[in-house]
From Swiss-Prot:
It catalyses: L-homoserine + ATP = O-phospho-L-homoserine + ADP + H(+). This is Homoserine kinase. Pathway: Amino-acid biosynthesis; L-threonine biosynthesis; L-threonine from L-aspartate: step 4/5. Signal peptide: none annotated. Keywords: Amino-acid biosynthesis, ATP-binding, Cytoplasm, Kinase, Nucleotide-binding, Threonine biosynthesis, Transferase. HAMAP family: Homoser_kinase. InterPro entries: GHMP_kinase_C_dom (IPR013750), GHMP_kinase_C_sf (IPR036554), GHMP_kinase_N_dom (IPR006204), GHMP_knse_ATP-bd_CS (IPR006203), Homoserine_kinase (IPR000870), Ribosomal_Su5_D2-typ_SF (IPR020568), Ribsml_uS5_D2-typ_fold_subgr (IPR014721). It comes from Helicobacter pylori (strain ATCC 700392 / 26695) (Campylobacter pylori). One of its GO terms (molecular function) is homoserine kinase activity.
Length: 293
């Protein structure tokens, strides 16, 4: 069996913990029944022992199977393309992939709602798991332990230019930087900007994204710990990025632009930040896929 799950970029400026989108950079997971347990990891995280011994994919996969009375062993080949601890949904990709794979082996129907709500048990950030499951641009929240979300597709004439620094940032640690309370003004600012940004994406008003993607809740505090991120954002917006936001909790930076502007934006960012990876990616509208039964 082969299951693939896309990278994601969440928060997107004002959409803290509720907005996210899917990027066409896929982890592929190859699983087959075996008389013994074996895991091989290729790509991102390769050669790092803890990603094998503490692998979230196999943990979730086996837990779901055992819950349904299956105690079999499997061989796993995890082909990771999503950067780890860089704010591009590596954990969500692993968890969603494990859930979808386990359900397929159990003979369950391919039900995205079932996948996303099971994934929520292991990953409580719906802004990451919804685009990983459904693809596209998603708005989501959790009510009574159930994910409520809507998706819209992202057109192919838009591209993502991702700047991926060589610095890991822990989501858990970065949350400790944030205040426990926000003022009414800060809250209204983010609510209004996130709402209008979603409308702009749905209606294709791309020229509004620059002003709509501003944030007063989380980005500044997080970016202060790694000031080069301010420079990335400034240069991206000066070179035709429609919006430029911290990807998840960082350290990666998400930039959206028109297809014709992507090569130049990549060139400028690569020149200014030669030690960082810069990648032009398509958006993904498919989400998790069973590529081979």
């Amino acid at each position: 069996m082969v299951v693939s799950v896309p990278a994601t970029s969440a928060n997107l400026g004002p959409g803290f913990d509720c907005l996210g989108l899917s990027l066409n950079l896929r982890n592929r997971f190859f699983i087959e029944p075996s008389s013994f347990h074996a895991v091989k990891l290729v790509g991102e995280g390769e050669g790092i022992p803890k990603f094998l011994t503490n692998n979230i994919f196999t943990k979730v996969f086996y837990e779901i199977l055992k819950k349904h009375g299956n105690d079999g062993s499997f061989k796993f080949l995890l082909h990771n393309k999503v950067p780890i601890t860089r704010g591009m949904g590596s954990s969500s990709a692993m968890i969603v992939g494990a859930v979808a794979s386990a359900f397929a082996f159990l003979g369950f129907d391919f039900d995205r709602e079932n996948i996303v709500n099971t994934a929520l048990i292991y990953e409580n950030h719906p802004d990451n798991i919804t685009p990983a499951v459904f693809g596209g641009y998603n708005a989501a929240f959790v009510e009574k332990k159930k994910v409520i979300s809507l998706k819209t597709k992202i057109p192919s004439f838009l591209k993502a230019v991702m700047v991926i620094p060589n610095r890991a940032i822990s989501t858990k640690q970065s949350r400790h930087l944030l205040p426990k309370r926000y003022s009414v003004q800060e809250s209204v600012f983010n609510l209004s900007h996130a709402s209008l940004m979603t409308m702009a994406i749905v209606q294709g008003k791309w020229d509004l994204l620059r002003c709509c993607s501003k944030d007063r809740m989380h980005q500044y505090k997080r970016m202060q710990t790694y000031p080069v991120l301010f420079a990335i954002q400034k240069i991206a917006l000066e070179n035709n990025a429609l919006m430029s936001t911290l990807s998840g909790s960082g350290s990666s930076f998400f930039n959206m632009c028109y297809e014709e502007d992507a090569p130049k934006l990549k060139q400028v960012l690569s020149k200014k930040f030669p030690k960082f990876r810069v990648a032009v990616l398509d958006f993904d509208n498919d989400g998790v896929l069973i590529e081979k039964d």
